[in-house]
Amino acid sequence: MSSDIAVRPVRESELATILRLWHEADVTPPSVTDSIEGLTRLIHEPGAVLLVAIIDARIVGSVIGGWDGWRGNIYRLAVTPECRRRGIARRLVEEISGALFDKGAQRLSALVEHEHPWAIGFWESLRDLGYQHDPKFARYIADRVIFRDT
């Protein structure tokens, strides 16, 4: 199970594979940040971490972690459909959580799509790692292209 999974930081040469994985995993709608250029910027940011899960030399999962000096955030947890329910997502969360805490984060939050009840169920299953739902917050976003056009 999860012992066969290797987790490590993504290599720049693998960024196109990450974009394909996100499309295949269908965990979130495509975003304006979904590009090789965007991911290249991300992996060169000191507070950012993009981890991949590998089985048999194949990338089967990924997760982004960001630390801004105040809190850690987890984004884009994705596992390819045929590899789900094998402990990969949990392992990625354990690894990204450790990386963000090592950077200095005292609290982590994860963005989870409301449209995916299975994702909410997954995060509920991580209570033993300290994760809990926080109903106090709603998320608001602004895309640069829209902001600049107003």
Role assignments for model-derived ranges:
Residues E124-P135:
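Conserved acetyl-CoA-binding loop of GNAT-fold acetyltransferases
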Residues L77-R84, V112-E113:
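A short, internal acetyl-CoA/4′-phosphopantetheine-binding micro-motif in the GNAT/acyltransferase core
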Residues V27, I88, A105, Y131:
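Short phosphate-binding/catalytic loops that engage adenosine nucleotides
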Residues M1-S3:
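Basic/polar N-terminal segments that are highly enriched at the extreme N-terminus
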Residues L100-V112:
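Conserved GNAT acetyl-CoA-binding A-motif
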Residues I5, P9-R76, T80, V93-E95, ...:
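Acetyl-CoA-dependent GNAT
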Residues A110-I120, I141:
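Conserved beta-strand-loop-alpha-helix junction that forms the acyl-donor binding cleft
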Residues R85-G98, E124-S125:
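Conserved acetyl-CoA-binding loop-helix of GNAT-fold acetyltransferases
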